[in-house]
UniProtKB/Swiss-Prot annotation:
The keyword Disulfide bond applies. It comes from Echis pyramidum leakeyi. A motif (Cell attachment site) lies at residues 24-26. It comes from the Eukaryota. Its main location: secreted. GO terms for cellular component: extracellular region. The disintegrin belongs to the short disintegrin subfamily. It is found in: Secreted. This is Disintegrin pyramidin-A. Expressed by the venom gland.
Length: 50
């Protein structure tokens, strides 16, 4: 499925809902979606959150 990335392990996508980037400050966690090796941005984050 994948070669590398925060949502890839052993050439497989990590399960949807797996945290791939922990929240910092008042930010929110980012989660794998089970379909990509990248760590998608949490859609519930504010517009100006990093």
């Amino acid at each position: 499925d994948c070669a590398s990335g925060p949502c890839c392990r052993d050439c497989k996508f990590l399960k949807e809902g797996t945290i791939c980037k922990r929240a910092r400050g008042d930010n929110m966690d980012d989660y794998c979606n089970g379909k990509t090796c990248d760590c998608p941005r949490n859609p519930h984050k504010g517009e100006h959150d990093p």
